[in-house]
Structures are given as C-alpha cells and as structure tokens.
C-alpha cells in the first residue's frame, strides 16, 4: 500500500563513479514486499527541483525498517540528493508500481537476471527473494566501463555472476548478450531491467521464453495521473491502447508493450 513518509537517512556513500548507495529508515519499509517496485523521492525542501525523482528499491530489511536505493547522480535532482547526510529526513512516497513476479519461478528452476547500468539495483532484492525459495540464479550485469561497476561481489554471493563492459575494462568486452553467447547460458525464466536497447535485444531473442522486463522511463507523478510515461501495446502499436509505466508497470511480460 502506497504511503508518504519522512524517512531518516541512515547512511549514504559513493560506491562507484557518480553511483550512490542511500539507506533510509522508517515504517514505510513494511509495505515493501514486491521486488522491482520504486519510490518517489522529494530530493529537497521547497519547489526546486519540482518533480519527485523515481528510484528503484534495491534491498529491503524489514527487521530494521531499512531499505537501500542505488542511483546515479547526474541531474539537478539526484545531485542534490547526493548531498543529503546521515540523520536528515527525506520525504518518500511509495512503494509504487508493480514489480517482478517472484511466484513465476519455481524451486529448482534457473532464473537469469540481466541488468544494465542503473537498471541493476532492483535485481538485487529480486535475486535474494528467488534464492530464498530455492531458485538457482545467474546474473549478467552490463556497464559502460570499470569505473561504474557496482555490487558485483554482492550478486556473486547469491549465484553465478558475469560482468560485461562496453569498453572491455572489466569482465567481458561488449554487451550482456555477448556474455550469454560466450558462456552458452540457458535458463527457465528471465528477469531484466536496463536501457531500452538492451531490452529490445533480449526481446528479439526470447519472445518464446517466460520473461519479464522493467522499463526505465522518466516519470512525473508516479501514480498514473500525469500520463508522462505511457507506452503502446504490441497488439495495438499505433492505436489508443497503452500502459502507464509508473502504475501498470514498471514490470511487464516480455512482448506486451512496444519498446
């Protein structure tokens, strides 16, 4: 159930180039039961920046009432968020959207989790949930270069983990699909989050597989009211049928929406 709450900053640190790990605490965490959902953060008091910033939920610790977000500080809003210190309060709205269907993976099956860039974080909570129910997980994490690689060791604690960098400075040179080809990776179910180009490549390969993708789109309200994040359905690509990423998604079955 969505709630609005002022949450306390437990810790914030830069873990890779311009990539920040922010831990917040509050009872809102008790509502975070679906990996792949996101929160809307009011990065500062006042009216500038005006819009809240959508950030995916990376890790949930309901015993401590804490959750972790990872984000890239690149625009005015996220750069402001990166200045927030331990003990400060941050206005949080969430959890929002529909996440990854953990129930679609069965114990004993193999799940392939593919993340690209800042699309990697929500896969961490998902991976933990899958492992807890007896699913074997394989992770492929794609980044531009070594300086922006994060959470490789944390994912490796949960299952086989491969990294690809576009420039070849770490792991496999190239894209996540190169890792799949190089290692002949097979799986029963696919979960993915990342850039549209990556999601399109996966969709082209795995239309017949059980697969779910999380879309990264710029969102305004986060609750389906402003229509800033609509996408067409593949069954009606030029018509009036659409889905809203923020409220109908951000997770969709592969092949449902136009990428």
From Swiss-Prot:
The cofactor remark states: Binds 1 [2Fe-2S] cluster per subunit.
Protein keywords: 2Fe-2S, Electron transport, FAD, Flavoprotein, Iron, Iron-sulfur, Metal-binding, Pyrimidine biosynthesis, Transport
Swiss-Prot/TrEMBL cofactor(s) = [2Fe-2S] cluster; FAD
One Pfam family matching this protein: FAD_binding_6
- InterPro entries, alphabetized: Cbr1-like_FAD-bd_dom (IPR008333), Cyt_c3_hydrogenase_gsu (IPR012165), Dihydroorotate_DH_ele_sf (IPR037117), Dihydroorotate_DH_Fe-S-bd (IPR019480), Dihydroorotate_DHASE_ETsu (IPR023455), FAD-bd_FR_type (IPR017927), FNR_nucleotide-bd (IPR039261), OxRdtase_FAD/NAD-bd (IPR001433)
State the Gene Ontology terms under molecular function.
2 iron, 2 sulfur cluster binding; electron transfer activity; flavin adenine dinucleotide binding; metal ion binding; oxidoreductase activity
State where FAD binds: 53-56, 70-72, 77-78
Q: Flavoprotein: present as a keyword of the record?
A: yes
Query: Which part of the chain is the FAD-binding FR-type domain?
Result: 2-102
Could you say which residues bind [2Fe-2S] cluster here?
A: 221, 226, 229, 246
- Biological processes annotated in GO: 'de novo' UMP biosynthetic process
The record's section on CDD domains has:
DHOD_e_trans
Q: In which pathway does it act?
A: Pyrimidine metabolism; UMP biosynthesis via de novo pathway; orotate from (S)-dihydroorotate (NAD(+) route): step 1/1
Has UniProt tagged this entry with the keyword Metal-binding?
yes
Quote the subunit structure annotation: Heterotetramer of 2 PyrK and 2 PyrD type B subunits.
What family does this chain come from, according to its entry?
Belongs to the PyrK family.
Q: What does this protein do?
A: Responsible for channeling the electrons from the oxidation of dihydroorotate from the FMN redox center in the PyrD type B subunit to the ultimate electron acceptor NAD(+).
Q: What's the protein called, per UniProt?
A: Dihydroorotate dehydrogenase B (NAD(+)), electron transfer subunit
Organism (species): Bacillus cereus (strain G9842)
């Amino acid at each position: 159930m969505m709630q609005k709450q002022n949450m306390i900053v437990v810790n914030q640190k830069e873990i890779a180039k311009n990539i920040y790990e922010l831990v917040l605490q509050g009872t809102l965490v008790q509502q975070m039961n679906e990996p792949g959902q996101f929160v809307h953060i009011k990065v500062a008091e006042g009216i500038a920046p005006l819009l809240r910033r959508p950030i995916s939920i990376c890790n949930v610790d309901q015993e401590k009432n804490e959750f972790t977000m990872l984000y890239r500080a690149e625009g005015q809003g996220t750069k402001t968020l990166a200045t927030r210190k331990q003990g400060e309060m941050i206005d949080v709205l969430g959890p929002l959207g529909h996440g990854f269907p953990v129930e679609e993976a069965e114990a004993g099956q193999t799940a392939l989790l593919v993340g690209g860039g800042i699309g990697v974080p929500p896969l961490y909570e998902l991976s933990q949930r899958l492992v807890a129910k007896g699913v074997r997980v394989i992770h492929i994490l794609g980044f531009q270069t070594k300086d922006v690689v994060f959470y490789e060791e944390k994912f490796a604690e949960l299952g086989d983990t491969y990294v690809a960098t576009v420039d070849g400075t770490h792991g496999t040179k190239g894209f996540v699909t190169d890792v799949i080809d190089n290692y002949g990776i097979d799986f029963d179910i696919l979960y993915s989050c990342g850039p549209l180009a990556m999601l399109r490549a996966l969709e082209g390969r795995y239309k017949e597989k059980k697969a779910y993708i999380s879309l990264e789109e710029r969102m305004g309200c986060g609750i389906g009211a402003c229509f800033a994040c609509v996408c067409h359905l593949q069954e009606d690509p030029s018509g009036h049928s659409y889905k809203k990423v923020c409220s109908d998604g951000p997770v969709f079955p592969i092949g449902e929406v136009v990428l």
